Amino acid sequence: MASCKLIIEDEVNIKIEGLDVDVRRKLANALKFEVPYARYMPQYKLGRWDGKVAFFGIGGTGYVNHLDVVQEVLAKNRVQIVDIDDRRHPIQLDFTPVTENYWKDQGVQWPEGHPAEGEDIILRDYQVDAINNFLNNPQSLQQIATGAGKTITTATLSHISEPYGRSLVIVPNKSLVEQTEEDYINCGLDVGVYFGDRKQLGKTHTICTWQSLNILDKKHKDGSAVLSLAEFLEGVSTIIVDEVHQAKAEVLKNLLTRNLRNAPIRWGLTGTVPKEKFEFESI
């Protein structure tokens, strides 16, 4: 039986060493998915692309969330992992399940000016279920319908994860930045936003769009911004992505797999789980 070495480089990326090219090619094929609309794209028409998206490189690189597929392919090809080099930063996550009275127990009430001013903030049963599912799975995705109080859910998750570092909440547009910020303020959290002309730094929790992070990165690289993306993300241990199905966008994918690759807590919320296999695998 052949052998190989598995390197877990961070919370997202893996590399496998010692495989012959045939096995690497089989892994790449097992984690390659067709793009249904590829035939309409110029690269496909010109014969420069096979119309598929690959999640395992022929050089032996892949992703942690595909390890089950990797192990299955290796077993079929009589290859054993004899050495595991886990380079992830060691952290012991310990979460206590929440109840509907989570914020009430913190002494938090709806603030002045809110329609429920002076009343205790009580979580709804489906919010409690969603939060506890996330706490049981620190790297996971859940389908949560629009209008189900996602901002209170994310505020609760951010507060619970405070002992482990900063949280970064990525939303798809500016209006959701402001909506999310409002509930974080209602819950008494130390929150800032980063978009447009509002760029608040040094906060425990930051709400932004992925477009704003991309602009920051580009401006620093061309010398027009003093702050680098790495400096902006320093201390972030929790990433919460709203409408995570948009993570298939290349910019957001790069942020999550490169700049934020060491964050141990990674939660995604979406109202729409992608139906296409290649889109689902990308998140």
What function would you assign to each model-found segment?
Residues M1-R88:
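N-terminal accessory nucleic-acid engagement/regulatory domains that precede
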Residues L67-Q127:
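Pre-P-loop entry segment of helicase/translocase ATPase cores
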Residues V70, S237-T238, E243-I283:
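Post-DEXD/H (motif II) to motif III coupling segment of the RecA-like Helicase ATP-binding lobe
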Residues I122, Y126, N136-S161:
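Walker A/P-loop
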Residues A148-C187, L252, K275:
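Conserved Walker A/P-loop ATP-binding site and its immediately adjacent core
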Residues E162, G223-V236, L256-A263:
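Short, conserved loop/helix-junction motifs that constitute active-site signature segments
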Residues K174-L176, K199-Q200, Q211-N214, H245-Q246, ...:
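Conserved nucleotide-binding/hydrolysis micro-motifs of P-loop NTPases
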Residues Y184-V226:
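Inter-Walker segment of RecA-like/P-loop motor cores
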